[in-house]
Amino acid sequence: ENSDVLEEFDRVLRFWFDRGIDGFRIDVANSLVKESGLPDLPENEKFGELVGDSPMWDQPELASIQRRWRAIADEYADTPEGPRMFVAEAYLPHDRLVRYLESDRLHTSFNFEFLISAWKANSLRTTITESLAAHESVGASATWVLGNHDNVRPVSRYGKEISGLDFSDPSAPHAQFHGTPTDVALGRCRA
């Protein structure tokens, strides 16, 4: 609600877009605004677990902020460098996550439902089917996250055998994000 903060974000986005970056990853995209009155977060007996119904998640003001940022990104659609984009980082179930991916909000997101799914055919099938349906409902591409810096490395979780899954097919109906290759020698260590 502070116009100075909103305008500073506008300036920062334009600064980097003007220099040709492709986009931004919005960390904890569902927690950029806290409930009015700034109430305390409920106590959580298990340190590190997210409190689902708290004053810092999914606040209505997020929509206007994300629409404001999207409008700025859309200003660059016809530039020589091409369109700009936003990627949401938020650990949310599909039905809540895709609200952030409506056509006038963020472009896509990391799909952590896939990351936390059991490594079993039925579980993966359900996760993939639900994810594709949810993303299709808002016209966004689904992504498939196997690992990140918050979780044990995939090689430790899934074993060292070659998997039958191939996420490198560019014709598949999902987006691909490739970060720094993981080092198998690190084993269970996080990035």
Language-model regions, residue ranges each:
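Active-site and adjacent substrate-binding regions of carbohydrate-active enzymes
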Residues: 1-191
